[in-house]
Protein backbone atom coordinates (compact mmCIF):
# COMPACT_ATOMS: atom_id res chain seq x y z
CA UNK A 1 0.00 0.00 0.00
CA UNK A 2 1.18 3.56 -0.64
CA UNK A 3 2.53 5.46 2.35
CA UNK A 4 0.22 8.48 2.64
CA UNK A 5 0.48 10.98 5.48
CA UNK A 6 -2.83 11.56 7.32
CA UNK A 7 -2.82 15.26 6.41
CA UNK A 8 -2.44 14.61 2.67
CA UNK A 9 -5.52 14.91 0.45
CA UNK A 10 -5.50 12.25 -2.27
CA UNK A 11 -8.51 11.82 -4.54
CA UNK A 12 -9.82 8.25 -4.30
CA UNK A 13 -9.77 7.92 -8.10
CA UNK A 14 -6.07 8.80 -8.39
CA UNK A 15 -3.92 5.84 -9.50
CA UNK A 16 -1.11 5.45 -6.98
CA UNK A 17 1.52 2.69 -7.19
CA UNK A 18 1.94 0.55 -4.09
CA UNK A 19 5.31 1.97 -3.01
CA UNK A 20 4.59 5.68 -3.54
CA UNK A 21 5.25 7.97 -0.56
CA UNK A 22 3.07 11.05 -0.09
CA UNK A 23 4.08 13.46 2.67
CA UNK A 24 2.24 15.96 4.87
CA UNK A 25 -0.22 18.43 3.36
CA UNK A 26 0.16 17.19 -0.22
CA UNK A 27 -2.80 17.37 -2.62
CA UNK A 28 -3.20 14.83 -5.44
CA UNK A 29 -6.05 15.30 -7.88
CA UNK A 30 -8.53 12.92 -9.43
CA UNK A 31 -6.91 12.29 -12.81
CA UNK A 32 -3.35 11.68 -11.60
CA UNK A 33 -1.32 8.52 -12.14
CA UNK A 34 1.84 8.09 -10.03
CA UNK A 35 4.19 5.27 -10.99
CA UNK A 36 6.38 3.10 -8.75
CA UNK A 37 8.86 4.75 -6.44
CA UNK A 38 7.52 8.29 -6.69
CA UNK A 39 8.08 10.42 -3.58
CA UNK A 40 6.10 13.54 -2.69
CA UNK A 41 7.62 15.51 0.16
CA UNK A 42 5.38 17.91 2.06
CA UNK A 43 3.06 20.52 0.49
CA UNK A 44 3.22 19.19 -3.08
CA UNK A 45 0.25 19.83 -5.39
CA UNK A 46 -0.31 17.55 -8.40
CA UNK A 47 -3.38 17.79 -10.62
CA UNK A 48 -4.34 16.26 -13.92
CA UNK A 49 -5.01 14.66 -16.21
CA UNK A 50 -1.34 13.82 -15.68
CA UNK A 51 0.76 10.68 -15.60
CA UNK A 52 4.17 10.05 -14.06
CA UNK A 53 6.51 7.13 -14.57
CA UNK A 54 8.73 5.64 -11.90
CA UNK A 55 11.13 7.25 -9.45
CA UNK A 56 9.99 10.86 -9.71
CA UNK A 57 10.64 13.08 -6.68
CA UNK A 58 8.66 16.20 -5.76
CA UNK A 59 9.90 18.72 -3.19
CA UNK A 60 7.80 21.12 -1.08
CA UNK A 61 5.55 23.59 -2.85
CA UNK A 62 6.17 22.19 -6.33
CA UNK A 63 2.94 22.58 -8.32
CA UNK A 64 2.68 20.13 -11.18
CA UNK A 65 -0.01 19.42 -13.78
CA UNK A 66 -2.34 22.36 -13.15
CA UNK A 67 -4.24 23.92 -16.02
CA UNK A 68 -2.57 26.10 -18.64
CA UNK A 69 -1.97 29.78 -17.94
CA UNK A 70 -2.83 30.55 -21.58
CA UNK A 71 -5.78 32.96 -21.88
CA UNK A 72 -7.09 30.87 -24.79
CA UNK A 73 -7.57 27.86 -22.53
CA UNK A 74 -11.27 27.23 -21.86
CA UNK A 75 -11.11 24.02 -19.86
CA UNK A 76 -10.65 21.50 -22.67
CA UNK A 77 -9.17 18.10 -21.74
CA UNK A 78 -5.38 18.41 -21.93
CA UNK A 79 -2.56 16.40 -20.42
CA UNK A 80 0.83 16.28 -18.77
CA UNK A 81 3.01 13.23 -19.47
CA UNK A 82 6.16 12.72 -17.40
CA UNK A 83 8.68 9.89 -17.69
CA UNK A 84 11.00 8.41 -15.07
CA UNK A 85 13.48 9.70 -12.48
CA UNK A 86 12.72 13.39 -12.71
CA UNK A 87 13.30 15.75 -9.78
CA UNK A 88 11.07 18.77 -9.15
CA UNK A 89 12.58 21.04 -6.51
CA UNK A 90 10.87 23.64 -4.34
CA UNK A 91 8.31 25.89 -6.08
CA UNK A 92 8.84 24.37 -9.53
CA UNK A 93 5.73 24.68 -11.72
CA UNK A 94 4.76 22.62 -14.77
CA UNK A 95 1.49 23.25 -16.65
CA UNK A 96 -0.68 21.01 -18.78
CA UNK A 97 -1.25 21.74 -22.47
CA UNK A 98 -3.67 24.28 -23.95
CA UNK A 99 -5.02 22.71 -27.15
CA UNK A 100 -7.70 20.04 -26.80
CA UNK A 101 -6.10 16.61 -26.57
CA UNK A 102 -2.61 18.10 -26.40
CA UNK A 103 0.08 17.25 -23.89
CA UNK A 104 3.00 18.87 -22.16
CA UNK A 105 5.69 16.17 -22.22
CA UNK A 106 8.75 15.63 -20.05
CA UNK A 107 11.15 12.74 -20.61
CA UNK A 108 13.48 11.03 -18.15
CA UNK A 109 16.20 12.06 -15.70
CA UNK A 110 15.49 15.79 -15.78
CA UNK A 111 16.20 18.23 -12.96
CA UNK A 112 13.91 21.20 -12.31
CA UNK A 113 15.48 23.46 -9.70
CA UNK A 114 13.98 26.06 -7.37
CA UNK A 115 11.13 28.18 -8.77
CA UNK A 116 11.63 27.23 -12.41
CA UNK A 117 8.69 27.02 -14.81
CA UNK A 118 7.79 25.02 -17.91
CA UNK A 119 4.65 26.34 -19.56
CA UNK A 120 1.84 24.69 -21.47
CA UNK A 121 2.67 22.36 -24.37
CA UNK A 122 6.41 22.31 -23.66
CA UNK A 123 8.26 19.28 -25.01
CA UNK A 124 11.27 18.52 -22.83
CA UNK A 125 13.67 15.68 -23.56
CA UNK A 126 15.96 13.72 -21.26
CA UNK A 127 18.75 14.77 -18.86
CA UNK A 128 17.71 18.44 -19.09
CA UNK A 129 18.48 20.91 -16.29
CA UNK A 130 16.26 23.90 -15.53
CA UNK A 131 18.28 25.97 -13.06
CA UNK A 132 16.71 28.21 -10.43
CA UNK A 133 14.06 30.61 -11.80
CA UNK A 134 14.63 29.47 -15.41
CA UNK A 135 11.41 29.98 -17.37
CA UNK A 136 10.19 28.36 -20.57
CA UNK A 137 7.00 29.80 -22.04
CA UNK A 138 4.38 27.80 -23.93
CA UNK A 139 5.28 25.41 -26.75
CA UNK A 140 9.03 25.52 -26.05
CA UNK A 141 11.03 22.45 -27.12
CA UNK A 142 14.16 21.51 -25.16
CA UNK A 143 16.52 18.82 -26.46
CA UNK A 144 18.38 16.18 -24.48
CA UNK A 145 21.15 17.32 -22.11
CA UNK A 146 20.36 21.01 -22.57
CA UNK A 147 20.96 23.34 -19.62
CA UNK A 148 18.91 26.45 -18.88
CA UNK A 149 20.88 28.55 -16.39
CA UNK A 150 19.38 30.64 -13.62
CA UNK A 151 16.78 33.31 -14.37
CA UNK A 152 16.83 32.84 -18.15
CA UNK A 153 13.58 33.42 -20.03
CA UNK A 154 12.68 31.50 -23.19
CA UNK A 155 10.04 32.89 -25.57
CA UNK A 156 7.06 30.89 -26.82
CA UNK A 157 7.72 28.35 -29.59
CA UNK A 158 11.51 28.54 -29.26
CA UNK A 159 13.48 25.32 -29.80
CA UNK A 160 16.62 24.68 -27.78
CA UNK A 161 18.85 22.05 -29.35
CA UNK A 162 20.37 19.09 -27.59
CA UNK A 163 23.56 19.68 -25.57
CA UNK A 164 23.02 23.45 -25.74
CA UNK A 165 23.42 25.82 -22.82
CA UNK A 166 21.46 29.01 -22.15
CA UNK A 167 23.35 31.46 -19.95
CA UNK A 168 22.04 32.98 -16.76
CA UNK A 169 19.50 35.80 -17.19
CA UNK A 170 19.47 35.37 -20.98
CA UNK A 171 16.41 36.52 -22.96
CA UNK A 172 15.94 33.89 -25.66
CA UNK A 173 13.53 34.80 -28.45
CA UNK A 174 15.04 32.67 -31.26
CA UNK A 175 16.12 29.05 -31.53
CA UNK A 176 19.35 27.82 -29.96
CA UNK A 177 21.50 25.54 -32.11
CA UNK A 178 22.54 22.17 -30.69
CA UNK A 179 25.98 22.06 -29.03
CA UNK A 180 26.18 25.85 -28.59
CA UNK A 181 26.15 28.37 -25.74
CA UNK A 182 23.98 31.48 -25.87
CA UNK A 183 23.86 34.35 -23.42
CA UNK A 184 22.82 37.98 -23.21
CA UNK A 185 19.75 40.19 -23.48
CA UNK A 186 18.82 39.47 -26.21
CA UNK A 187 20.65 36.15 -26.34
CA UNK A 188 23.41 35.69 -28.90
CA UNK A 189 25.48 32.61 -29.70
CA UNK A 190 28.82 32.93 -27.90
CA UNK A 191 30.64 29.66 -28.50
CA UNK A 192 30.53 25.91 -28.92
CA UNK A 193 29.60 24.01 -25.76
CA UNK A 194 32.95 22.22 -25.88
CA UNK A 195 33.12 21.28 -22.21
CA UNK A 196 29.58 19.93 -22.24
CA UNK A 197 30.33 17.83 -25.32
CA UNK A 198 33.53 16.47 -23.78
CA UNK A 199 31.67 15.51 -20.62
CA UNK A 200 29.11 13.65 -22.71
CA UNK A 201 31.82 11.66 -24.51
CA UNK A 202 31.77 13.25 -27.96
CA UNK A 203 34.81 12.54 -30.11
CA UNK A 204 37.45 15.04 -31.17
CA UNK A 205 36.08 14.77 -34.71
CA UNK A 206 32.63 15.77 -33.44
CA UNK A 207 34.12 18.80 -31.70
CA UNK A 208 36.00 19.84 -34.82
CA UNK A 209 32.87 19.46 -36.95
CA UNK A 210 30.78 21.60 -34.58
CA UNK A 211 33.51 24.24 -34.33
CA UNK A 212 33.60 24.44 -38.10
CA UNK A 213 29.81 24.94 -38.13
CA UNK A 214 30.20 27.72 -35.59
CA UNK A 215 32.84 29.49 -37.69
CA UNK A 216 30.82 29.23 -40.90
CA UNK A 217 27.54 30.37 -39.34
CA UNK A 218 28.71 32.94 -36.79
CA UNK A 219 32.29 34.06 -37.41
CA UNK A 220 32.45 34.39 -41.21
CA UNK A 221 30.24 37.43 -41.76
CA UNK A 222 30.66 37.25 -45.54
CA UNK A 223 28.55 34.11 -45.89
CA UNK A 224 24.77 34.01 -45.90
CA UNK A 225 23.19 31.19 -43.92
CA UNK A 226 22.40 29.36 -47.17
CA UNK A 227 25.99 29.70 -48.37
CA UNK A 228 27.33 28.53 -45.02
CA UNK A 229 25.15 25.43 -45.12
CA UNK A 230 26.27 24.62 -48.66
CA UNK A 231 29.92 24.86 -47.62
CA UNK A 232 29.24 22.59 -44.65
CA UNK A 233 27.56 20.02 -46.87
CA UNK A 234 30.67 19.85 -49.04
CA UNK A 235 33.21 19.94 -46.22
CA UNK A 236 35.38 17.12 -44.97
CA UNK A 237 32.93 16.60 -42.10
CA UNK A 238 29.86 16.31 -44.30
CA UNK A 239 29.02 12.85 -42.95
CA UNK A 240 29.51 13.76 -39.30
CA UNK A 241 26.31 13.23 -37.30
CA UNK A 242 26.70 16.44 -35.28
CA UNK A 243 27.23 18.53 -38.40
CA UNK A 244 24.23 16.96 -40.13
CA UNK A 245 22.11 17.61 -37.04
CA UNK A 246 23.04 21.30 -37.03
CA UNK A 247 22.17 21.61 -40.72
CA UNK A 248 18.81 19.93 -40.12
CA UNK A 249 18.11 22.18 -37.13
CA UNK A 250 18.86 25.36 -39.08
CA UNK A 251 16.76 24.27 -42.06
CA UNK A 252 13.72 23.43 -39.93
CA UNK A 253 13.90 26.45 -37.61
CA UNK A 254 10.72 28.53 -37.77
CA UNK A 255 11.94 31.44 -35.65
CA UNK A 256 15.48 31.80 -36.91
CA UNK A 257 18.34 31.17 -34.52
CA UNK A 258 20.34 33.25 -32.05
CA UNK A 259 23.26 34.93 -33.83
Swiss-Prot record:
It catalyses: a (3R)-hydroxyacyl-[ACP] + UDP-N-acetyl-alpha-D-glucosamine = a UDP-3-O-[(3R)-3-hydroxyacyl]-N-acetyl-alpha-D-glucosamine + holo-[ACP]. Homotrimer. InterPro entries: Acetyltransf_C (IPR029098), Acetyltransf_C_sf (IPR037157), Hexapep (IPR001451), Lipid_A_LpxA (IPR010137), Trimer_LpxA-like_sf (IPR011004). Keywords: Acyltransferase, Cytoplasm, Lipid A biosynthesis, Lipid biosynthesis, Lipid metabolism, Repeat, Transferase. Gene3D superfamilies: Hexapeptide repeat proteins (2.160.10.10), Udp N-acetylglucosamine O-acyltransferase, C-terminal domain (1.20.1180.10). It holds the Pfam family Hexapep. This is Acyl-[acyl-carrier-protein]--UDP-N-acetylglucosamine O-acyltransferase. Its main location: cytoplasm. The gene is lpxA. SUPFAM superfamilies: Trimeric LpxA-like enzymes (SSF51161). It is found in: Cytoplasm. GO terms for molecular function: acyl-[acyl-carrier-protein]-UDP-N-acetylglucosamine O-acyltransferase activity. Pathway: Glycolipid biosynthesis; lipid IV(A) biosynthesis; lipid IV(A) from (3R)-3-hydroxytetradecanoyl-[acyl-carrier-protein] and UDP-N-acetyl-alpha-D-glucosamine: step 1/6.
Amino acid sequence: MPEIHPTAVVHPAAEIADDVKIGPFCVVGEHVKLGPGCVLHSHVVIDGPSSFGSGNEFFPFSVIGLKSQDLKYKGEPTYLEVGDNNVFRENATINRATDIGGATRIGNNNLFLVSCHAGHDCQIGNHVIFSGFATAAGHVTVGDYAILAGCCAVHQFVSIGEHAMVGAMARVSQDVLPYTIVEGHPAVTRSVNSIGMQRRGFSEEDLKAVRMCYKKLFVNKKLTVHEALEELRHSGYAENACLRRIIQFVETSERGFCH
